[in-house]
Amino acid sequence: MLITKLSRWCALTVISVSLMACQSTSEQATTKSVNHVPLTVERIYKDDEFSSQWLGQIRWLADGSGYTAIEKSEKTKETDKDSNDDTEKAESIGKDIVFYDPTTLARQVLISAEQLIPAGKDQALSIDNYLWSDDRSQLLIYTNSKKVWRSNSRGDYWILNLKTNQLSQLGGKDVQDSSLMFAKFSPDGSKVAYVTDNNIYVETLANHHIKQLTSDAGNGIINGLFDWVYEEEFSIRDGFRWSPNGKSIAYWQLDTRGSKDFIMINNTDELYPTLTKFPYPKVGEENALAKIGIVNVSNAKTTWAKLPNNSREMYVPRMNWSGNSEQVLIQHVNRKQDTNKLYLTEIKNGDVELILTEQEENFLDFYDDAKWLENGTDFIWKSERSGWRHIYKVSRDGSNIVNLTDGAFDITDVQAIDEKNGWIYFIASPDNVAQRYLYRSKLDGTLSNQRITPKEYTGSNRYQMSSDGQWAIHSFSSFAQPTQKQLIKVDGHQAKHQLMTNEKLNKQLAALAKPEHEFFQVTAQDGVVLDGYIMRPADFDASKKYPIIFYVYGEPAGQTAQDKWRGNAYLWDQMLTEQGFIVASIDNRGTPAPKGRAWRKSIYGAVGILSSRDQADALKAMTERWSYIDSDRVGIWGHSGGGSMTLNMLFRYPELYKVGISLAPVADQRLYDSIYQERYSGLLSDYAEGYEQGSPITHAKNLQGKLLLIHGTGDDNVHYQGTERLINELIKYNRQFDFMSYPNRSHGIREGEGTTLHLKTMMTNYFNQHLK
């Protein structure tokens, strides 16, 4: 498509920004490109040439005595007897569940694939997930799963009784395929509860008697699961919890009748178009009403929690049992999401007692379950009340709060609680926000922030810890180093067994022309420090001028400047450096970098405004410091929130950015969902100007450079509707652009044969065509 180059340029006052010294995480290539086979899109995305080693699903046993993994069975079956080449091929009958002793790494097959073959079949069940009963006498297998929005949360469940070796399917003799959700054992292992048709059922395993616990689903009522927006923005899918004594189940009920439906059209799968309709509350629209019920398993009677002032203007993002079977802890949040009240709820009558209130001037940006200590007198809680995200121990009545971590840094995750030895383990990085390390503090508050990860593991470290905190699967990677995994004894970080080295991938990477990279910092116009990374070609020559491509996200759901392996995303960037580009990324304010409350919440009421200014400031600082960056050839791209940022950079700073590729953007913030957008942008009635100015569509008339706009028509998250409205606005002002729609693809634009290869080829060609 021929695109008209516009001659009207907006003036911009140049603001002085400075580039700070490079951090110690800088890494320079040790060799230049010599006879290396160049990377191609096909090598990365079609041939799987650089696929990472896969360790498989690992799960620690509840007592910490070892872990289980799913591995291909050595048992085979004969196939293809009638094939044209007269050969017989052997293939595995399925997968085994094996046990590993962490001390010796001795391997034992606990469940063989043969045990998972249903009567009359010759192939074992495919294991999508599994759960042990507490006494490990029964295994719950999840299989034949189907995608519901983001995850495969609907499927078939089977029980394997290890005492009788009997395999049976749950849901009754007339159960429909892939119709059960979130099945889990009662604490004593005698029953399994699950959701089907938006109601909760419990099945007794001894006789497979099924009892319906809720019966009011339908006409917008859903029990034990969530509507689209709760699932997406509160990251919750499983909507019910067994009591510790197994006599009750606490559950969410959502009444979505007040929420308007969004409708998507599918033009490709049938002869005539089909429609998908689901409740989706947009900004300012009516939400679902959330309630918490506690149902008695024996008589199916529900007691409702008496939450004060509960309405469609309130949220219930978290709920769980409170260390006993008599009370449930409920978190109750107002629509503005600046106040979270924690209530202890009596299951006998639904009465509630307020024990803790978290309140912010602007918004609460995370929700976490309270983690109860074994005695039930205290729970572990994360809070930003000090200005930094830290861990606290809170007494049952909320009267005593002890800070277990301290300092001018954020913890990112609680990893494990070792009550026996008095430790809590967590992830943090006080000295470098691009990295992650394991720390621990004493549960009594006497010692905090003891680093466990050794210094040689500079980069990003993750830990899958046993429940007692004694053992862990340690995963380590850095910017240009693929993930490796080892089994460690946590005390002293003692490496016991190497589980994954990625040796093959490392050899393949060594054969490539390795680009230079470094992490750096710039100071924005108001003195705030911004972090980023930059990649330069292996044959880099500082006396030359290079076009630069920025990868951007820039919203509260993602940090891009991280010292970790990014897989194919890194390889695509490396390919771009081989083709003569410099690649960079900057984290602006509002991203979830562990830099404190003020950093993350400075964007309130102005999403897209301050963040785009930060990006522009960073670009100007970089071009002032590094003369090899060609300021006339600046490109940018991003997906989702990054797609929105790409549009804002092209529209708000057209004199700086010449080429942009925007994937699945939120073109108008008023079209996005209520929970996310109102959390960060405020209520529309209070911040109408912020919504207006922060939305790219408002500034579409300023487009001067090259824009490639991409969206999937089946996007249930960021609706295609917004892109169509943006297209109308660009047409209105005769702004020429390129556009690609992917029929019926969802937000990730991954479904369908050849989609990723096609997408990445198009993006690569676009930058080469317009930025060189």
Identify the meaning behind each predicted range.
Residues 1-5:
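N-terminal secretory signal peptides that target proteins for export/translocation
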Residues 260-261, 317-318, 325, 461-772:
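Serine-hydrolase catalytic core recognition
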